[in-house]
Amino acid sequence: MHSRSSDPPTGSKLAALTLGAVGVVYGDIGTSPLYALKEVFAHGRIDITPDNIYGILSLVVWTLTVIVSLKYVLLILRADNNGEGGLIAMLALASTAVKERPVLRRRLLILGVFGTAIFFGDGVITPAISVLSAVEGLEVAAPGLHRYVVPVTLVVLTLLFAAQRFGTGGIGKFFGPVTAVWFIVLALLGVVHIVENPAVLAALSPHYALAFMWQHPGTAFVSLGAVVLCVTGAEALYADMGHFGKRPIRLAWFSLVMPALMINYFGQGAMLLQRPETVKNPFYEMAPEWALYPLIVLATLATVIASQALITAAFSVTKQAIQLGYFPRLRVTHTSVKETGQIYVPFVNWGLYACIVLAVVTFGSSSKLASAYGIAVTTDMLITTTMTFFVIRYSWKYPWALCVAATGFFFLVDAMFFAANAIKILDGGWFPLAIGAAMFTLMMTWKQGRRLMSERLREEAIDLKSFLESVFISPPTRVQGTAVFLAAEQGSTPNALLHNLKHNKVLHEQNLFVTVRHHEVPWIPFSKRCEIESLGHCCWQVTLNFGFKNEPDVPEALALLRGRGVQLDDMETSYFLSRDIVIPTIGKGMAIWREKLFCSMHRNAAAAADFLNLPTNRVVELGSKVEI
């Protein structure tokens, strides 16, 4: 069970959480200096003049300030769902707040699911562009090494994904310190060049950004598509709130991450003012020649850590989507006996790996991948801002004017960045959108298919109480032990019970009819886990409640019934499940291609017994057919 102290962390605990947040939360945004400023001036779209450099630096500073410091750190971190963050947590919060408005709720659900789907597109681009940009330092060290950039990147990524099944428990403790060293190095690299040209600090004034946009509106608009790269990974501040808490995340941002990023960007700008020819790779050009290879190694470590944080998030988001009914059950392996959150999902791991390899081979450089990156990031930002509005309005009950004031400005900023990236869809933006569209189709097809299945089963269902009354008019033979029948719908007779009576003609001494419910809250404590109703004749109707971050462990939950009149012996308990075979039919439910897709997903889903942590040697599965 997840437990969280209500007291904010202080002292050594706060320091440890802050250092942990540096490694996990800020890995992605911390590697942006590798490619963000380089990409703004790439392809000769923007001339490298002092006015343009000042304007771009000012845009970078105020983009970091508005989107990260104001929007995420000060506003969105307040929209927690029982202490948890992330798009799924916000989706659950917003949809619960508007449950009295079914049309609006459905639209929000679709929007939230699309945002979650786009996250997987973002998850493909982030490791690809991060590791590529780090390894591209080899080109600066020795131009002849250019041909090794893609192969070395693929080797690093292959090792990273192959290591996932072992978990990160052992090496995870080094993520924070290594990333902290990375941020210190970012600041040191920048300081050297700022000292040489301190006039660059004038770009802290927003008037340079405004003047740049006023004097060169077309150029400024195009530049926004690359400037947004400086805030990639900002959504991790909210997504990882449940792991570290608001205070450590805010402290890490204002005390280390934001200053280091700004110093590094200004250092790159100061160098470009003096040596415009370094624009090809300003990050690595800042380093003295003797430090290049150590810097490449450190950058590669930092990008691997950033990628690891995203892979872990992908596992977590997938598990939450499964429990909320938007994805079929997948095999989930726990990689730590101490931390329930440390999981490994093989299907997601190798699916991500295949798409990332495809991205690296197809695009071949961080510069080409940058065109694909922005659209995924800005789409998620827009969706998060939209969801925040509905949380403020319907969950916090703030007046309309205040809600619009709180989110309207951020929505306009996000929309501007989104529009600047939308013009790059044909240049690569299609890639994460295609992945997102595929994931969205899978998720909505699964949700709709499960709904159709439930409707069909409900139509054919027999009321459990009435059925038991008829059975006990002429009672069958009772055998020793306890039978646990898993039922999708509370109060309906499980098909497994019907088949058991039909073929075996016996009933156990004790019978539990168990329905597992996943709720739109992250955590449900043990005290609210079980609801039990006696049906007579040593039969009980049991409802088990889980949050979308709880571990759905049925035997552990049923053990709570021992003090409530039910005698459970693990070695005398059998679990009966219905294994439904889905038949697609023309003229009902969904389009036939979606029904066939759903059938395939259903057929290949992991067994319910594994997902619910049932002991495999005590499970009996009985099949039935369902037409949708």
Swiss-Prot record:
GO cellular component labels: plasma membrane
Membrane-spanning residues: 56-76, 109-129, 141-161, 174-194, 209-229, 253-273, 295-315, 343-363, 372-392, 400-420, 425-445
Membrane topology according to the record: Multi-pass membrane protein
Molecular function per GO: potassium ion transmembrane transporter activity; symporter activity
Keywords on record: Cell inner membrane, Cell membrane, Ion transport, Membrane, Potassium, Potassium transport, Symport, Transmembrane, Transmembrane helix, Transport
Principal cellular location given in the protein's record: membrane
Catalytic activity: K(+)(in) + H(+)(in) = K(+)(out) + H(+)(out)
Cell compartment(s), UniProt: Cell inner membrane
InterPro entries: K+_transporter, K_trans_C, K_trans_N, Kup
UniProt xrefs under PANTHER family: LOW AFFINITY POTASSIUM TRANSPORT SYSTEM PROTEIN KUP, OSMOTIC STRESS POTASSIUM TRANSPORTER
Family: Belongs to the HAK/KUP transporter (TC 2.A.72) family.
Function description: Transport of potassium into the cell. Likely operates as a K(+):H(+) symporter.
Name of the protein in question: Probable potassium transport system protein Kup
Source organism phylogeny: Bacteria, Pseudomonadati, Pseudomonadota, Betaproteobacteria, Burkholderiales
